[in-house]
């Protein structure tokens, strides 16, 4: 069992039959009354995100999540296909369940597949990925790194705000947690 006050971002727990992942957690002390825990949660099975509050002493069962390294193969007919790097077993995950993560993944990229028991509940991305810009506005002569930036569409469909000097065909390193441009690759 884990107390609500001990739940941190990234942890997964059971609330009744719901398998929930903590996206953000903070203590809140109102002017009157007791401290409460405000959390942004994601229902792992449905993919829905919502806000909830708990008392710090509320108890939950912590979910044991196992991970397996697998390679992303392809997506077809609403199913993303992955292959275990050690056993060559293939896993099928509904695209709807991992659509946000797939914006950072090219075919043949290694990811970690997360399991709760035998149920696939999601994928964990590497911290950074290298993607190629396929479309962006033309560069402005004399633009500097300190400019406000412009939107660029990556080869996976991800849209990232990039500095003005970036052109189509440039490979960029992208942070998968924040979706931000880090540097040229």
Swiss-Prot record:
One family name in Pfam for this protein: EFP_N
GO CC term, one of those recorded: cytoplasm
Cellular compartments annotated: Cytoplasm
UniProt keywords, alphabetically: Cytoplasm, Elongation factor, Protein biosynthesis
Residue stretches spanning the membrane: none
Pathway: Protein biosynthesis; polypeptide chain elongation
Molecular function terms from GO: translation elongation factor activity
Keyword Protein biosynthesis included in the entry's annotation: yes
InterPro entries on file: Elong-fact-P_C (IPR015365), NA-bd_OB-fold (IPR012340), Rib_uL2_dom2 (IPR014722), Transl_elong_fac_P/YeiP (IPR020599), Transl_elong_KOW-like (IPR013185), Transl_elong_P/YeiP_cen (IPR001059), Transl_elong_P/YeiP_CS (IPR013852), Transl_elongation_fac_P (IPR011768)
Keyword Cytoplasm appears in the UniProt entry: yes
SMART domains per the UniProt record, alphabetical: EFP (SM01185), Elong-fact-P_C (SM00841)
Listed GO biological process terms: peptide biosynthetic process
Function, in words: Involved in peptide bond synthesis. Stimulates efficient translation and peptide-bond synthesis on native or reconstituted 70S ribosomes in vitro. Probably functions indirectly by altering the affinity of the ribosome for aminoacyl-tRNA, thus increasing their reactivity as acceptors for peptidyl transferase.
Recorded family membership: Belongs to the elongation factor P family.
Protein name: Elongation factor P
Lineage, broadest ranks: Bacteria, Bacillati, Bacillota, Bacilli, Lactobacillales
